[in-house]
A protein has these predicted regions:
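Active-site proximal loops enriched in glycine and acidic residues that flank catalytic Cys/His/Asp
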Residues: 72, 108, 136-138, 174-178, ...
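Glycine-centered loop/turn positions within well-structured domains
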Residues: 30, 42, 76, 141-142, ...
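Radical SAM enzyme [4Fe-4S]-AdoMet core and its adjacent flexible, acidic
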Residues: 79-96, 100, 146-147, 210-241
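Proteins enriched for Cys/Gly/acidic motifs involved in redox and nucleic-acid/cofactor modification
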Residues: 1-78, 117, 132, 153-161, ...
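Conserved, mostly hydrophobic/aromatic
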Residues: 32, 52, 70, 106, ...
Length: 313
């Protein structure tokens, strides 16, 4: 691998011109025991900060992009290879200065690398979304250790507490793996309790899948497929209730909504609290708006994963 990746990464093409994904690094240093990425893509390589700024500036000021989602295997490790320190806060400061009228979204962070400085910058910047994708994968210390995940139950709980204290209206997304080798009833019950107690706004859960060439492939105490499916189902059912409770709290609130498309009964969009493609949507009633416009919307109804709103004239 070259010591620095090419500064002119081809941009991942977004589904619509108003939203774009910008890759800030390649490769991964985390070496989770279930994952092949470090073997396939090599060591973590941060992109040059100037090339990222240039790309985002062009997306925003030339292409009219309204939302920039930063992506990498772990965006929070940005700069550690080139500057020997976490550079994401510095990158965010520079990106936030490009325009007041953009949403900057943080995807794929690592709980062990989210610093107080990062949380403070998010809290202070009006154009950084009140949203954080924070995949924890599990919460039981012995499972986290077997997964070779940095962090612990105490560290993750403390981090979420600090994030919510500084940014009370933040929407947190997480990803979980159920049925990892060694996950017994006790470990699973602990995970279930954590999901209920923490109340993530968005959550994805995946039954563990054996991957050839990973350390976990040969771990003892593999979990039966039926048990994995059952655990997956239990978490999803619980999350449905958690999500519905959270969505109902938005009724009566006025949110800025990015209009994304037209449907038979009106329009559909998202607020800063929903990421493109993976989270719920907001169905809009009112005068037709241009796609890519951000409009104030009063939330009038909620379902388990979506909201309904009326455009405020």
């Amino acid at each position: 691998h070259p010591s620095h990746p090419s500064s002119s990464y081809p941009r991942i093409i977004a589904t619509l011109p108003h939203t774009a994904y910008v890759k800030i690094a390649d490769g991964c240093n985390n070496c989770c025991s279930y994952c092949l990425i470090p073997a396939l893509r090599g060591k973590y390589q941060s992109r040059d900060i100037d090339s990222i700024i240039k790309e985002v500036d062009s997306l925003v000021n030339v292409a009219g992009t309204r939302e920039i989602s930063l992506i990498a295997q772990d965006i929070t490790l940005y700069g550690m290879d080139t500057h020997e320190r976490f550079m994401l806060p510095e990158l965010l400061k520079q990106l936030a200065a490009i325009s007041d009228n953009i949403w900057i979204r943080l995807m794929y962070t690592h709980p062990a690398h989210v610093t107080d400085e990062l949380i403070e910058i998010m809290a202070a910047s009006s154009n950084i979304c009140r949203y954080l994708d924070l995949p924890v994968q599990h919460i039981n210390d012995s499972i986290l250790q077997a997964m070779n995940r940095k962090g612990s139950f105490r560290q993750i709980k403390g981090l979420i507490g600090r994030i919510r204290q500084l940014i009370p209206d933040i929407a947190l997304r997480t990803s979980l793996i159920v049925g990892f080798p060694g996950e017994g009833e006790d470990e699973f019950e602990m995970l279930l309790g954590f999901v209920e107690e923490t109340g993530f706004e968005h959550l994805g859960v995946f039954p563990y899948s054996k991957e050839h060439g990973t350390p976990a492939f040969n771990f003892p105490n593999q979990v039966d497929e039926m048990v994995k499916e059952e655990r997956h189902h239990l978490i999803m059912e619980l999350q449905k209730k958690v999500s519905f409770k959270k969505k109902k709290k938005k009724i009566g609130k006025i949110l800025d909504v990015l209009v994304e498309g037209y449907i038979e009964q009106g329009m559909v969009g998202r607020s800063q609290y929903e990421a493109p493609e993976i989270d719920g949507a907001i169905y809009l009633k009112g005068r037709y708006q241009k796609i890519g416009e951000i409009v104030p919307v009063e939330i009038i109804a909620a379902t388990e994963y979506d909201l309904v709103g009326r455009i405020v004239s």
